Amino acid sequence: MRNFLTIWFRELSACFLSPVAYVLMVVFLAVTSATFLLDITQDAALDQPLTVTLFESILVWLTILVTVVCMRLFAEEKRSGTLETLMTVPVTEAQIVLGKYAGALSFLLLVTFPVAITLLLVVAVSPVLQLGDLDGGALLSGGLILILVSSLLVAVGLLVSLLTRNQIIAAICCFCAVWGVLLF
């Protein structure tokens, strides 16, 4: 268990030590908020519930975020030669894979966390802007589904990263695989 936690925190800290994490967080929040705002200002979006519009806009951008997060998981380790070093340490392969999975999923959830704050703001201003009633159950279940879909997409991205050596190839294959899973 200690090895798993060590790998998990190593992955998570490696992500947050670079400014990329903070840039991803700001860009993801800005893009999903702008997409949602454009969707609710159009007449076509008024035909469906507000929660559907919100979670559709998040899901589309989540595929790109998952691709960016997962492309480096194992492809970078293979390219730099640190995977062999990691395999010589007394850890099991399952601990390595689960630690990297937990690190990537934690990072993804932390990057998407500001969207939850946006949800609270939408709930707060919806009576003022006359956006209609927001169902709390739909918001809660939508958030849970978003976490579950994120978990699935990170698992697919981890698999693709395991199969490739190059990060760019991993990103392209991950993007195609993620959309293949979502469209299936």
Please provide the spans of the model-predicted regions.
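Long, hydrophobic alpha-helical segments
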Residues: 54-76
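Helix-loop-helix units of permease transmembrane domains in multi-pass membrane transporters
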Residues: 73-105
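Secretory targeting signals
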Residues: 35-37, 44, 48-52, 56, ...
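Transmembrane helix-loop junction
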Residues: 10, 14, 76, 89, ...
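Aromatic- and glycine-rich beta-strand/loop motifs that create alpha-glucan
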Residues: 1-25
